[in-house]
Design a protein with these regions (language model features):
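Transmembrane helix boundary and interhelical loop/hinge segments in multi-pass membrane proteins
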Residues: 79-95, 99
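Interfacial transmembrane-helix starts/ends
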Residues: 11, 15, 19, 100-111
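Junction motif at the cytosolic side of a transmembrane helix
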Residues: 192-199, 265-285
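Aromatic- and glycine-rich beta-strand/loop motifs that create alpha-glucan
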Residues: 1-27
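Central hydrophobic cores of alpha-helical transmembrane segments
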Residues: 28-32, 203-217, 234
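Secretory targeting signals
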Residues: 35-83, 104-198, 233-262
């Protein structure tokens, strides 16, 4: 019980520090303004036509479109780059007291902040289209029309989703896969960032996320040379675009959902093992 109480205290302390930073508020406001400007008067377009669109479809679009996806992941990297928060003398204190409770507190915080971040993205999209929203699990005809003619719905920016994927899977199936991948990518980014801080206390916390964003940009935007093709199989942020994943094991061009889950699971387990080993040693300072 004492260990659980200490762990909860560390989680609470991390959230207090995160919310007390002006950076967090700025990121949340920037995301809200970005999506508002990006989708324009989408609510007005839907109300004028008397149609409704699925919230799951909107979430799939923003996570599959490279520009909105870049924005989402950059915001997440900027929030998570401070994990774990470092105080002078805290590690020496932990060596004599609750090292495991501290470690579990950091892990729970990273998982929780990942869930909250994407819940916030989901809420922003919901506010953009309410009350013209539906929660049906199948693809809506409105979504198909919006892909073909986004200007008719007040959207002046890029709005697209692969129709070939829509013919093979339902919106609910793809949404579930997208949520799983986003959660795993977020946790992997947080754990790798935390591992970097534990191995290199004075190192740049944004390095892990920065490298991931650069890999994603090279694999999806630059697309120069053979390396860009192979980067799709090792770039975690690229795997969040479920519309670009292969739907068959015989397609060697893009990774499958199963491969992405296994790869990301490895990215989660490796830093956890390293951190568990590091926190148990008395040379951690």
């Amino acid at each position: 019980m004492d260990s659980m109480r200490r762990m909860n205290a560390y989680v609470k302390l991390n959230f207090q520090r995160c919310l007390s930073q002006g950076k967090t508020l700025v990121i949340c406001l920037c995301l809200a303004v970005f999506f508002y400007l990006y989708f324009g008067d989408v609510r007005g377009g839907l109300m004028e036509s008397g149609q409704k669109i699925g919230i799951m479809e909107m979430f799939l679009v923003v996570t599959n479109n490279m520009y909105t996806s870049f924005t989402i992941w950059i915001g997440f990297v900027l929030i998570i780059c401070d994990s774990p928060y470092r105080d002078d003398g805290v590690y020496q204190y932990l060596l004599r007291t609750s090292r495991r409770s501290w470690l579990w507190g950091q892990i729970v915080y990273i998982v929780a902040i990942t869930v909250i971040y994407f819940a916030y993205i989901f809420l922003l999209l919901l506010l953009l289209i309410v009350p013209q929203v539906t929660f049906q699990t199948a693809w809506t005809t409105t979504f198909v029309k919006m892909i073909n003619a986004p200007f008719g719905y007040g959207i002046s920016n890029y709005f697209s989703f692969p129709v070939s994927v829509m013919r093979q899977t339902t919106a609910l199936q793809l949404f579930g896969r997208c949520i799983v991948l986003c959660m795993m990518i977020g946790m992997a980014t947080g754990f790798l960032t935390m591992m970097l801080h534990m191995l290199w206390p004075s190192g740049p916390g944004i390095a892990i996320g920065g490298i991931g964003i650069a890999m994603d940009y090279w694999a999806t935007v630059v697309r120069v040379g053979v390396t860009s093709k192979y980067l799709l199989f090792i770039s975690p942020f690229s795997m969040s675009r479920v519309g670009n994943l292969s739907t068959t094991a015989f397609n060697r061009v893009n990774p499958t959902f199963s491969y992405a889950c296994l790869f990301l699971a490895g990215m989660i387990l490796v830093p956890l093992a390293v951190m568990n080993l590091k926190i148990g040693r008395y040379d951690y300072s």
